[in-house]
Amino acid sequence: MHIARRDFLKYGGGTVAALALPGGLAAADAPRKPIIDVHMHAYPATMKLPVPIVNPITGVKSSIVTGADHLTACLEQMRRYNIVKGVVSGGDGDRLQAAYDWHDRDPERIVAGAGIRGSEDTPLPPLDTLRSAFASGKLKVLGEVTAQYAGLSISDPKYDPYLALAEEFDAPVAIHLGTMPAGTTFDPCCRTARAAFGHPETVEGALNKHPKLRVNLMHSGWPYVEEAEAMMMLYDNVNIDTGALSWLLPRPAFHDYLRRLVDAGFGKRVMFGSDHMYWPDGIGLAVEHVEAATFLTEEQKRDIFYNNAAAFYKLAPAAPKALSDAGTSRPPNG
């Protein structure tokens, strides 16, 4: 599947809608058992999103315009699919505040994470800022860590103080791994990004320097399945999430990758993560594609959707309020 980065992140397009399989998951058919989404994204409330927001798989246009609209639409999707906990990534500065805004909007549902990069144009935030946030309880997760976009691996010494901080506060670390949209390295935002730093094995140095870490290899390290398996085999403090491949890949390709991981014995280490980015409806597509995996038992689906993340992220059981409003529905900007 070839989608240029600018088109992928901004406009999507009906030209790739044929990649989606027919039969959307309507709200009435959505799973009613609770789900944890460990891979969500927040944007500043006043940020103007590139319009129109068009889902790159379905071609459906969204009416959202700002980061505030995006938050409202994502929370609606979470209620619709009974996602009772969501780990949301915000970047430095305003985007870090965006993660806090999500939490303030629905504190029982949202877990705030700090996205860090370490490139020249997106430097690492002051360590004291994160220390204070972890100490206050505002932050619970370090991630998404996008060292790959900085042309580095998480094992680079510049990240050591941040990983030590995560160890100190027993905070999970979520690391971007795998590949990136076509053309990423030619985008002014990401000239330092390199595919070579997406290999799961690049995490190994950090795991040995910081053995108390709990690490989520995001996107399941796709397409490097053997390396993802090797890391989980050797390090029992490593889990993976499904990430954007759960809805951006054609369903058969995603299922083949997921089946490989489960058949290899890692069904207790895979966590659901939608990685919806600009597209709130990507959340539902991701849920649908896991639900449609007929090779999974119901127990395995519950592990992926809830149990594995609840254990790894040490999340409390779903609050009754979160379950009671699971079927509500309102317009995305309502």
Regions picked out by a protein language model, each given a short descriptive name:
Residues 22, 29-153, 157-161, 165, ...:
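Mid-domain alpha/beta scaffold segments of enzyme catalytic cores
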Residues 42, 92, 118, 146, ...:
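Active-site-proximal loop/turn and secondary-structure-junction residues that shape catalytic pockets
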Residues 2-19, 31-38, 47-48, 54-85, ...:
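Mid-to-C-terminal alpha-helical segments outside catalytic/metal-binding sites
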Residues 82, 106, 137, 143-146, ...:
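Sec/Tat-exported extracytoplasmic proteins
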Residues 103-110, 120, 140-141, 155-271:
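Catalytic pocket-lining loop regions of alpha/beta-barrel enzymes
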Residues 9, 75, 79, 87, ...:
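Non-transmembrane alpha-helical segments in soluble domains
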Residues 44-45, 95-98, 150-152, 181-184, ...:
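Short catalytic/ligand-binding loop motif for oxyanion handling, primarily in non-cytosolic enzymes
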